Design a protein with these regions (language model features):
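N-terminal strand-loop element at the rim of the active site
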Residues: 13-17, 30-69, 183, 260-262
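Short His-centered aromatic/hydrophobic patch
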Residues: 92-98, 115
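Active-site proximal beta-strand in glycosyltransferases
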Residues: 105-148
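Membrane-proximal helix-turn-helix segments that form the acceptor-binding/catalytic region
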Residues: 135-176
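Conserved donor-binding/catalytic core segment of Leloir-type glycosyltransferases
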Residues: 214-233, 239-242
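Aromatic "clamp/platform" in nucleotide-sugar-dependent glycosyltransferases that forms part
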Residues: 283, 302
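Short hydrophobic beta-strand element within catalytic cores of glycosyltransferases
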Residues: 319-323
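Conserved acidic donor-binding segment of nucleotide-sugar-dependent glycosyltransferases
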Residues: 334-348, 356-362
Length: 395
């Protein structure tokens, strides 16, 4: 497939300041530098947060009123646009078109599914969300323990339903992009993919612009930056970890940045605990200013795909800590802890001990900071360019 002059469409429901939104924007900028025309289609464009990356090579079109990802109205509109703009490749980040797949395939356009989660993340997310809900009501809790868990989890039926879903997605696409080589291997093994299907699964690491002169002299500041959502992010763990560590770190403080559905609960829990030197700061449109001041970043998620917050922290010389909850997290921080601190899932006591060690030991922290500055070079946009060139050549 000839790359220069190629027309590519990317369909995604909301374009704003989310991690994936930023990746999609930066990818458009990269494509434009390769001579590719990019056509974005979305339901909601948050114009103040998300700017068109390269107006000479990029366009943005809102889907018609009433359109959803995916329904018949959206599919009909996208098919019309594919023909009108002579689009050759349709990239679908995360939202599988389900029953409309055959219609999209009938257009003759190459279909690329771009996954931004670890394998079977939906399964793990729904289990965590369900656990949170049932805690609120005794009868639901008992039902969960004695009925739903044995039937769905012990028999594996629920997990198998998600495995079947993944097989359908991979089979229906020309290529399936995943976040790192380890995920490609995990999908092939967990789904028992035949060779012709396994060959469709291609790793594509998300990259970012390298910070030319990161600030290395930092404040005694620990931060959390991210979406406030219970099922995956578990920001309450940040508070519990600080409850264990704050007495040993009297000259350090914690700031929590973010917004989301769990915001009020996080605020209430923070007030309930009454801990010193920890505060909720809300949403920030300038995370780079936070990273400029911070020494340590905490990630306390139950599951993660390729958390951009970790590589953003490394890019600014902030030492990240995270539970070793996925291959993506382990790849970013390094199995040898050379570019961050991995914690056994989900030990709060170990997390607190390692946090105290990191904050107290200046030499140790400086060594990890240098490891972060070396590791971040693996995320340079040049590597992404090479990967995309190979992807287009395969289509």
């Amino acid at each position: 497939m000839k790359i220069e002059g190629l027309h590519v469409a990317i369909v995604y429901p909301v374009l704003g300041l989310g991690g994936l939104d930023v990746v999609i924007r930066d990818t458009g900028k990269l494509f434009a530098s390769m001579g590719i025309h990019v056509h974005y289609y979305t339901i909601e464009w948050r114009e103040a947060e998300w700017q068109l990356p390269a107006p000479t090579h990029c366009s943005l079109t809102l889907l018609p009123d009433g359109a959803e990802l995916w329904n018949q109205q959206a599919v009909d509109f996208v098919l019309q646009e594919l023909r009108l703009r002579q689009i050759s490749v349709l990239i679908i980040p995360n939202y599988f078109p389900g029953p409309y797949l055959d219609l999209l395939r009938s257009s003759g356009v190459k279909l690329v599914f771009w996954s931004h989660g670890m394998p079977l993340w939906e399964y793990h997310d729904s289990i965590e969300a369900r656990r949170f809900v049932v805690k609120k009501k005794l009868s639901r809790h008992l039902e969960w323990i004695f009925l739903r868990v044995p039937f769905k989890l012990w028999t594996g039926a629920y997990r198998r339903s998600w495995e079947d879903y993944y097989r359908r997605v991979i089979e229906g696409m020309d290529l399936y992009l995943t976040l790192c080589p380890a995920y490609a291997r995990e999908l092939a093994e967990q789904l028992c993919l035949p060779p012709e299907q396994a060959s469709k699964v291609v790793p594509l690491i998300n990259t970012l612009q390298i910070e030319p002169q990161p600030t290395l002299e930092k404040e005694k500041l620990i931060v959390f930056v991210g979406r406030l959502n219970y099922a995956d992010k578990r920001v309450d763990r940040v508070i519990d970890i600080w409850a264990r560590a704050h007495k040993a770190l009297p000259d350090w403080r914690v700031e929590i940045y973010g917004a989301g559905p769990d915001e009020q609960r996080v605020k209430a829990y923070l007030e309930q605990k009454g801990l010193p030197r920890i505060r909720f700061c809300g949403y920030t449109a300038e995370p780079s200013e936070v990273y400029r001041r911070a020494s340590v970043l905490l990630l306390t998620s139950t599951h993660e795909g390729w958390p951009m917050v970790l590589i953003e922290a490394q890019n600014h010389g902030v030492v990240p800590m995270a539970f070793a909850c996925s291959s993506g997290v382990r790849t970013i921080l390094g199995e040898d802890n050379r570019a961050g601190v991995l914690i056994r899932p989900f030990s709060l006591s170990q997390y607190a001990r390692q946090l105290v060690k990191l904050c107290r030991d200046t030499d140790y922290r400086a060594k990890l900071q240098q490891g972060c500055l070396s590791k971040r070079l693996e995320y340079s946009p040049e590597r992404s360019r090479e990967a995309w060139e190979e992807i287009f050549q395969r289509l």
